[in-house]
Design a protein with these regions (language model features):
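TRNA-recognition modules of translation machinery and tRNA-sensing kinases, especially anticodon-binding
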Residues: 2-100
Length: 100
């Protein structure tokens, strides 16, 4: 099923990327995960890094800090990653996050 969706995305012009599974605090803050979702994220104190709660965090940070040339704004990226997060509320307790 994963390959089916990735193939469809690539056919629609998206480029598949393999993002990292660990991000720094700036990356998590820049995508709105911190401070709002801090209690749901896994933090590795020794390395000062967070496990990604969703692929969106590293994918949206790929061009962070870059100045893109005029007319070069149409990057279409997709990626598949494991997602590491504590499930909040009763939704996660009942299905253990398997539906997400």
């Amino acid at each position: 099923m994963i390959n089916f969706f990735l193939d469809r995305a690539e056919a629609a012009g998206y480029e598949e990327v393999i993002p990292p599974h660990l991000v720094n605090e700036d990356s998590a803050r820049g995508t709105g995960q911190l401070p709002d979702k801090e209690g749901q994220m896994y933090y590795m104190e020794k390395d000062d890094l967070y496990l990604i709660p969703t692929a969106e965090v590293p994918v949206t940070n790929i061009f962070r800090g870059d100045i893109l040339p005029e007319g070069d704004f149409s990057h279409k990226l997709c990626g598949y990653t494991p997602c590491f997060r504590r499930e909040a509320g009763s939704y996660g307790a009942h299905v253990r996050g398997l539906n997400r």
